[in-house]
Amino acid sequence: MSLRAFMLCVCLLLQSVGARPASELQNLERLLQDQLSSTEHPEEDRLDRTREEPQLGGSSSREAADESALTRLFADLLRTSKRSWGRYKKGGMRSCFGVRLERIGSFSGLGC
């Protein structure tokens, strides 16, 4: 096959592929447009959600449970980090056999 024929086939193939957008691209474009419109009109979205909530029947309680679980998780992480910070500040690094000792027998935290 000659180079001219090959280039002609490639050009025709690119022309046919590029002539119409793929359905995935159309879906992506539609999603992006929806996202842009939702950021432009947050008041309307809030009104739409309040209208939809009675139809969903309990989604607000599920969302509240998810939010409370997330809040508990973050609160637990904050409490844990404060406790571990206090250990490092007072006693230094912990090892498998307990805390670092300045005097023998001053702590009884031996063991893994």
Swiss-Prot record:
- InterPro entries attached to this UniProt entry: C_natriurtcpep, Natr_peptide, Natr_peptide_CS
- Predominant location of this chain? secreted
Which first-to-last residue range defines the signal peptide?
Answer: 1-19
GO CC, any one term: extracellular region
Note whether Hydrolase occurs among the keywords: no
The UniProt transmembrane annotation reads none
- One Gene Ontology term from the biological process aspect of the record: blood vessel diameter maintenance
Disulfide feature: C96-C112
The alphabetical list of record keywords is: Cleavage on pair of basic residues, Disulfide bond, Hormone, Secreted, Signal, Vasoactive
UniProt feature, compositional bias: Basic and acidic residues = 40-54
Q: Where is this region: Disordered?
A: 33-67
Q: Which PANTHER family match?
A: C-TYPE NATRIURETIC PEPTIDE, C-TYPE NATRIURETIC PEPTIDE 3-LIKE PRECURSOR
Protein family according to the UniProt entry: Belongs to the natriuretic peptide family.
Tell me the function of this protein.
Exhibits natriuretic and vasodepressant activity. Has cGMP-stimulating activity. May help to regulate body fluid homeostasis in a variety of aquatic environments.
Q: What is this protein called?
A: C-type natriuretic peptide 3
Q: Origin organism of this chain?
A: Oryzias latipes (Japanese rice fish)
